[in-house]
């Protein structure tokens, strides 16, 4: 009999988030859902952002199989200039993929 491998696997409800057209004088916030679609405990490690203008946090750092949590993120466009901007939020985890990327976009005007 084969022994089934137990692995954690992370799924993001969105891999691209577009704030649309925004102004530079507000902070924009939203969240997506992270789900452990594997069959072992998922451990979320460091959450990295590309610059000080972007922040991200999770409600939980350990997810049982089929369990979900929110990834909250914010973008402060002040001082970023006008036009199309793109920031990355990198989520590290104990999975085969090692990390997952949420791309955050906006047009500042």
What are these regions (language model features)?
Residues 81-108:
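Terminal connector regions
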Residues 17, 67-73:
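Short strand-edge motifs at loop-to-beta-strand transitions and within beta-strands
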Residues 30-32, 45, 71-73, 87, ...:
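Hydrophobic residues positioned within well-ordered beta-strands of beta-sheet architectures
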Residues 24-31, 78-88:
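Short, solvent-exposed loop/turn segments enriched in Ser/Thr/Gly
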Residues 37-40, 79, 95:
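Short, acidic/polar linear motifs in exposed loop/turn regions
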């Amino acid at each position: 009999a084969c022994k089934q491998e137990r692995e954690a696997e992370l799924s993001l409800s969105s891999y691209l988030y577009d704030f649309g057209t925004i102004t530079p004088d507000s902070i924009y916030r939203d969240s997506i859902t992270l789900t452990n679609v594997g069959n072992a405990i998922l451990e979320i490690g460091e959450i990295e952002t590309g610059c000080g203008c972007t922040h991200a946090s999770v409600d939980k750092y350990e997810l049982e199989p089929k369990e979900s949590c929110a990834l909250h993120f914010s973008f402060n466009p002040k001082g970023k200039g006008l036009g199309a901007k793109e920031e990355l939020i990198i989520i590290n985890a104990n999975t085969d993929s090692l990390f997952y990327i949420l791309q955050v976009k906006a047009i500042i005007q």
